[in-house]
Amino acid sequence: MPRRPLIVAVLFGALALTGCTSTPAASPSPTPTTAATAAPSGDGTLLIGTLFPMTGDNAASGAAQVAGTELAVRDILAEQTTPTQPVQLIHRNSAGDLAAAYADLVARGVDLVLWDATTALPADADSTVGNATMVALGDFANGGTPLAADKAFTARLKTADPGLAGTDGGAEAYDGVVTAALAALITGDDGGASLAAGWPQVISGSAVCASWGECVFALAEKQIIDYQGITGVRS
């Protein structure tokens, strides 16, 4: 069943975090490094398109991935930071007319596309999404195959969609959204080129953080982060 876009707000601006209560894991101070940058091209809204299977044999995983993205956004908003800029999720069916789905996401000007965690990224994917950055969520799957969520995360996913029939891919989708938000925060821009430049910086440092709140706190302390979320260490 088609889902309406979810529009919410998330902090990407200055890291004025007075009152933030998240406590990151202790880590050594990082050595400053030269980070890749791109000319800003965003419009102030992080617009994330998703291509998950809404029909067919993998529809249960598609639903879990939708739930994972929506839960991630909700968790970002739950932190005691001041939301200043919006992020919008637009879900499309990777198991339907894929060319039409690509065209629709391009027409809507998405900054980033998250591709289904259960299937390989098509070889021509990068050339079909305009200026957006395409990310294969399978990269978050340790061992290459998304696994069912544990009991605690399953319960959390079901707060986003109580009717879930499976949870495979939900964790990967969750971490994909958090990584995108952190990439935008690190680069100070939501444009596709900036997200591509910021993406590897989310896991490039020594300050291990396991949640949006911990990572934002670490960034505010000028640390170089290593986001290890629901899926753990990136393999």
Predicted regions and their residues:
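Extracytosolic ligand-binding ectodomains
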Residues: 2-235
